[in-house]
């Protein structure tokens, strides 16, 4: 592929779009952002082979470069991925290009927890190998990481819904990165470092279990997508349109009016966050 000057401009657009599309599903006890400085970066132990083999998009297209999650975090001066753990994953990836996971037996969770402030777990699925259910290995990895670290962020780099068992929901923060394109690693680094406030919203309802999806012919009728759950019920973890941010706001004077078929909703919204205004 021939390089052109416009590629850098396109990369900046791709990076901004990917960062703005990140959906923050959960964030408790200020797990995110990893608000470090250049002099005192936040030390993060990153787990999951998806940090190396980060899926970028659908098959049939090949971007001129791919920035994986580990590379993106490494380039961010306020975040410092654990060097030893990163070396283990890079070496394993060279020997196992098929994308198999690094065995947990070769890792000392307690040792990494003592040397780092936080942990990040990457769950990755490409469009060609999309399975919404976590493997037993992934569940075990989450249990061991959350058992050793008190501050854990879970990143989902997948085409869509992933079933989140209880151990996954125990993570302090959950980010749906999706298939974020060639700048995925840089975009995620912008979000977790606090340079960009996540503003993405879910375009679908996120149920508790995969079985909640009705296995029927996909027809664009009145009950398609999120309307199915609105009509027929089911346990929903995150509803259609859901997405958190780092800022805080207070709502008051909420009123709803109905005039024939016209519904009017009004409210007063006040920014209460200092660092990240809504």
List each language-model region with its residue ranges.
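C-terminal non-catalytic regions of proteins with extracellular/luminal or membrane-system context
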Residues: 1-278
């Amino acid at each position: 592929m021939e390089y052109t000057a416009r590629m850098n401009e396109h990369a900046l657009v791709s990076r901004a779009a990917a960062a703005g599309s990140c959906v923050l599903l959960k964030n408790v006890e200020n797990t995110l952002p990893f608000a470090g400085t250049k002099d005192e970066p936040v030390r993060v132990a990153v787990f999951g082979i998806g940090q190396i083999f980060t899926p970028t998009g659908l098959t049939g297209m090949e971007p001129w470069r791919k920035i994986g999650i580990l590379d993106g975090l490494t380039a961010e001066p306020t975040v410092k991925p654990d060097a030893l753990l990163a070396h283990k994953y890079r070496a394993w990836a060279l020997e196992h290009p098929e994308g198999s996971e690094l065995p947990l037996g070769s890792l000392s969770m307690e040792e990494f927890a003592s040397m780092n402030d936080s942990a990040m777990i990457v769950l990755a699925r490409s469009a060609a190998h999309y399975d919404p259910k976590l493997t037993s290995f992934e569940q075990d990895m989450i249990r061991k990481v959350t058992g050793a670290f008190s501050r854990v962020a879970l990143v989902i780099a997948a085409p869509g819904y992933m079933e989140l068992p209880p151990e996954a929901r125990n993570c302090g923060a959950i980010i749906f990165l999706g298939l974020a394109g060639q700048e995925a690693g840089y975009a995620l680094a912008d979000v977790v470092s606090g340079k960009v406030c996540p503003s993405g919203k879910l375009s679908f309802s996120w149920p508790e279990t995969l079985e909640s999806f009705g296995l029927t012919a996909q027809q664009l009728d009145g009950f398609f997508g999120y309307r199915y759950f609105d009509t027929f019920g089911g346990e929903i973890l995150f509803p259609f349109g859901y997405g958190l941010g780092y800022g805080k706001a207070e709502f008051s004077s909420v009123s709803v009016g109905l005039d024939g078929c016209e519904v009017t909703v009004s409210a007063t919204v006040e920014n209460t966050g200092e660092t990240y205004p809504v």
